[in-house]
Amino acid sequence: MRVLFIGAHVGKGGGLALQTFQVFTGLRRHIEVDLLCLDALGVHRTMAEIPGVRFAGPLVFPKGITYLERAIRQVQDDYDLFQVLDPYFSLPAAFLARAFPRAVFFGTDPRAEIGWRYGPHMNAFTRLVLAPLVSGTPLVVNSQALADRFRRYRPRIILGGVDVQRFDRLPSKEAARHAVGVPPGRTLLVTVGKVIPVKRLEWLMEVVRQLPSVEALVVGGYTEEHYSDQYYRTLLASYPDIRDRVHFVGEVTWDQVPTHLAAADIFVFPSKFEGMPNALLEAMASGLPVVVSDIPPHRELIQHGRTGFLARDPLEMARLVATLANHEDLRSSVGEAGRDYVRQNLSSEACTQAFLDLYKRLIAGDLGRTAPAEEPVELSRTHRD
């Protein structure tokens, strides 16, 4: 079996790109898989230097769609199946190249994402454009929450996985804080993700403002297309009184994330929308207790009070953080329960096997063409309490 992964980029990073790259490397241990994507500068670009990765051209919109389409046509006869990894570049490129059979993976809802960036009128436009691109191909999503949003396309659920071995030998807290440049003493919060409005970092800023003994690390780039660094500057201007306690470290390489997690006491994730957040999975795998926003995908992962905590607003988030900060035994028990849950249910091996099973069924013709349905089809287990 030969499979071609088709994605937008690797170099810029982001949880979804890293999660799909992890699936790509995992599958290479079982079948022949190559990755075709666009070239983008970023701290993660060195990940694309492994065998099997090919650039079709630079990451520019909309020209990048044409680059990918041409590259797909050139190699189309060499592959048994095509795995589409993003809705903006690889999906229209594979559609135009008539690459079949193909599977489509969504780790976000592009209809909502476009609406946030460009306004509700673009949300409606995206809905119209997306329908013919997705219809007739198996759609895979990485959470029940996304499956509910795409119900009419009969989505199949393959939960995101994390390479738990990356978190088996973490440095000590003291060594990690020295490495990231944060002095010991205060309770240290950490969040990982791009500094963009959907991450709702004002909640984190409010938590730090309300708890004088707390500092925070924000690990993620704060310049992004469309947003530039406007959101980052707005945060700095809105919270001048806590600038010395909130450290924006920018984008770091994938292998540096475990050290930043090891330096912290509590992981905070106030995002307003996610698919299956890779950052949260990695925080739980590292053994950190987590306090996250109460949104559907987080409810799939978190059993409130046991594997983490769900907060409905910044005041509740601050209260939960304060409780954890004052009770080391609670931090330990919640962090351990979260780590055990991820290791038992959300390993990268389980995710890889689910994709392998999907591909075998698709090539064998066992999966019918997409048609409206009432319930999503589940290929891997979800957490429902």
In which residue ranges do the predicted regions lie?
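Conserved donor-binding/catalytic core segment of Leloir-type glycosyltransferases
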Residues: 4-5, 183-199, 205-209, 217-219
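Conserved acidic donor-binding segment of nucleotide-sugar-dependent glycosyltransferases
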Residues: 303-315, 323-329
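Short hydrophobic beta-strand element within catalytic cores of glycosyltransferases
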Residues: 280, 289-292
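Aromatic "clamp/platform" in nucleotide-sugar-dependent glycosyltransferases that forms part
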Residues: 272
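A short, histidine- and acid-enriched strand-loop-helix "catalytic/donor-clamping" loop
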Residues: 103-121, 222
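Short His-centered aromatic/hydrophobic patch
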Residues: 84-90, 109
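Short, structured helix-loop element that forms part of the nucleotide-activated donor/catalytic region
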Residues: 44-48, 215-245, 256
